[in-house]
Each structure stands twice: as C-alpha cells, then as structure tokens.
Amino acid sequence: MTTPTLLRVGLDIGGTKTEAVALDPNGRLVGRLRMPTELGAERVLATAERAVRGLSFQTGRPLSAFASIGIGIPGAVDRETGEVRHAFNLDLAELQLGRLLSELVGVPVRVENDVTAAALGANHLLELDGTIAYLNLGTGLAAGIVVDGAPWRGAHGVAGEIGHLPIDPNGYACPCGQFGCLETVASGSAISRAWPHGGEHPAQDVVRAMEAGDVEAAAVVARLVQGAASCVRVLALSLDPQSIIIGGGLRLLGEPLIGGIRATLEQWAEQSSFLAALDLPRRVRVLPKHSSAAAVGAAIIGA
C-alpha cells in the first residue's frame, strides 16, 4: 500500500482576508482558498482554524495528511513560541497562535512575520537564486531578505526594517518614535495623511486625481515614487541583491508607481556613473497581481 503524500499548509493572515494554500513535497500548489479575516484574538484563531479545515475539505485529505502549518501574520512574532503581539490591524494585542492552533487541528504550527513569509514565497514562486530583497509597499513599509533560499533576519531580527530609516530629521513623526522615516513617505499610511479626502482607497483616489490633472495629487504621487525608489536604492547599496521584488498592496497602482520608480532610478543613473554601473532598473521585479507569495512562503517556513 502506498503511503499518502503529506502536504504543507501555509496561511497568510491579513487585516481584511486570509489566504490558505497546500503544497505537495515538490512545492507545487495543490489547494488554495481565501476568506475574510475576523478581527480580535479569538476570531483570528477561529479564522485560522476554519482555513485549515477548509483546505482539508478542498483537497479531500484529513488533517492528519498535513505535515505542518506555517503562518505569516503582521505584528511582533515570537518564532520560538508562536506568540503574536501588537497586530493592530487585526485588533490583536496578544495571542498564542501557534500553540492554540496546533491544539485545535493536531498539526505542528510555526508562525512568522508576514513580510518575511512573502519574501520567501516570492523567491520560490519566481524561481530566484542568490540574494533577493522583497520590498513590501503596503500600509506600512518593510523589506524581507532571502539568501540562498533561506530568510535572513540579522543579529536581532530587524534586518529589512528599512521603513524606519530616517531620511529627513525634520519630517513627519513615525510610529517608531523617530522623525522623517521612509515609512512616512513611501507607504499607504503616508498617502492617507497626504491625501486625507481619498475615502477608503486613498492611493487609488490620488492616482485618479493626478491623471485628471490635479497638481496637488501629482505632488503626492511624486513623493511616493521618490520614496519607493529610495527604498530600492537603499536595498541595492546595503545588500547588493540579484533581484528586488516589489510587493504589497501599493504595487497594484501599476504604471504610475512602478514605471515611476524605474524612471527615477534611470534618472539617478544618468546623474551618477556609480549608480549607472549598478543597473538598478533591471533588478526591479514586481510580484504578480494575484500571487500567493505570503501563504506559499508560510508553508515553506512551516516545514
């Protein structure tokens, strides 16, 4: 009798939706589902359990066929204990997510920061080698780093926290306590502050206004583009990666952002032979629109 193949499960728990995937031993996607994330510690746990059981139903496999579960989630993550703290967009102050979910479904669980998981997933899905940097342009700003297929976190686990690199000491206050950080320029929260009348989707609204000829909107978008291009330059000069992958919700702005980043990098290259030699525009890649990178990366981490 042939032993059934064990699957690896990955969850990407975000503030609005949770995505779950199942990978076979070769890393191929054999199951995927999405569902709304319910907020609050108990409901986040319930969402995670429902996602795992949903994958079991979808794949026609019992929970015992799942070798491991990895979870990518925002907030402060203790990778040793599986505890999550200060995940504000999930209305979650503290949750022993790894231990409690494992008790509910009977499968080992590992928990990781969502950006690190997305970096690992992007590296896998795009079949990249060497050193890659994943630039997450979302509500906040951070990067994940992968070296030879493994996440690199640094000595204290803060490698890639470029959102808290100050570039203007006279700039806006950052939640980290500093002033003028990159996150105050190149993030969804920065756009919300600069374009407060943009409704529920200020980034999309400001781009539409720019395209309609609004001068103020054009200045907001230009500041975002300059900040994002600066992030690419920082990652290139500090890590020298083969590829810099742009992910996060802001990437869905498309050409106004991505084309603007490349144009800015090209302009800088014209002004600096040093930057020109680095060929930064060629290194920039964009995560596809419907990519499951964070969930796939979580599945890999869970193994």
Stretch-by-stretch model annotation:
Residues 36-39, 92, 158-161:
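A short acidic/small-residue loop/turn micro-motif
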Residues 1-68, 78-81, 103-107, 121-131, ...:
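ATP-binding/phosphotransfer module of carbohydrate and carboxylate kinases, centering on a glycine-rich
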Residues 15, 117, 139:
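Short, glycine/acidic-enriched loop or turn micro-motifs at the edges of active sites
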Residues 33-35, 88, 155:
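Short hydrophobic alpha-helix segments
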Residues 12, 68-74, 112, 134-140, ...:
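Short beta-strand segments
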Residues 82-93:
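A charged helix-plus-loop insertion that forms the helical arch/lid used to bind
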Residues 130-185:
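Glycine-rich phosphate-binding loop of actin/hexokinase-like ATP-binding domains
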Residues 110, 116:
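Glycine/small-residue-rich loop that forms an oxyanion/phosphate-binding "nest" at active or ligand-binding sites
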